Amino acid sequence: MERWFKSLFVLVLFFVFTASAADKLPNIVILATGGTIAGSAATGTQTTGYKAGALGVDTLINAVPEVKKLANVKGEQFSNMASENMTGDVVLKLSQRVNELLARDDVDGVVITHGTDTVEESAYFLHLTVKSDKPVVFVAAMRPATAISADGPMNLLEAVRVAGDKQSRGRGVMVVLNDRIGSARYITKTNASTLDTFKANEEGYLGVIIGNRIYYQNRIDKLHTTRSVFDVRGLTSLPKVDILYGYQDDPEYLYDAAIQHGVKGIVYAGMGAGSVSVRGIAGMRKAMEKGVVVIRSTRTGNGIVPPDEELPGLVSDSLNPAHARILLMLALTRTSDPKVIQEYFHTY
């Protein structure tokens, strides 16, 4: 009988200490949306032609049991698609769900698994619309989960580490891949295939993860999250904004088509510092006469588009075309005043 009581006492102590340790860990929700990180292929050497969004969130979490030493994790399957199929309506609902989660006292941060092709767009949308300073971290992968040396598991582990760290609060939405922590405002995909594809060439990264430790190096001055004026919690749809590309012989009829399809805004991915051909100028002016807001950006990948009174439209500041489209959609939910919208682009 005495031995039985001793065994029971040890068992009770074990559960008490286990529960105590779990209570000290941050509570992180992992929202899965699909992408290559949840991709599956026929063989371990196949890194193209795989099916994105084939695996569920529980499979992703169970593949990295170490995450449970970093946080109390809970998985939620929000969607399961290749990110080229992500739409504004889905991202709007994603932002609303994240806001719901972060409003809870029992949630300390959110990790979102996503495809690499459009992760910068989704991340920037949430960067402008999440109303909390709790960490929100997007994570992705360039190789499917079934690949030899898949990058997804380590990326997921590091994303949970970042989301659970108190230093991560108030930094806006972040994107974590390959040991680097990028701001959603600046990060962009720069290579179609290589692992080290996400960069912020001009501005640099927020930090890095080395040897299981987070080293933050920068903060951004641009407004975001709790300091953003954009609130989508009650929205059901977003204004339609298209991107038109500038190139030799770019035709005016592209603007005609956009106008006919009822766009509210056009982002021009221009040559150089937002240069526009005579055909593009004619198209822009025609669109602006119809009340369409036009933003000039650059197709170069880096640099600021400065104001030019001789050219029509507003300027994107340092936002690339994909990011500029996100900001213009949100701006149009509040105003169509060009002066106010231009100030948004210099502020966010």
Swiss-Prot record:
It is an enzyme of class 3 (hydrolase). Gene3D superfamilies: 3.40.50.40, L-asparaginase, N-terminal domain (3.40.50.1170). The keyword Transmembrane helix does not apply. It holds the Pfam family Asparaginase_C. It catalyses: L-asparagine + H2O = L-aspartate + NH4(+). PROSITE patterns: ASN_GLN_ASE_1, ASN_GLN_ASE_2, ASN_GLN_ASE_3. GO terms for molecular function: asparaginase activity. CDD domains: L-asparaginase_like (cd00411). Residues 26-348 form the Asparaginase/glutaminase domain. Substrate binds at residues 83, 116-117. GO terms for biological process: asparagine metabolic process. Keywords: Hydrolase, Pharmaceutical, Signal. Homotetramer. This is L-asparaginase. It comes from Dickeya chrysanthemi. The gene is ansB.
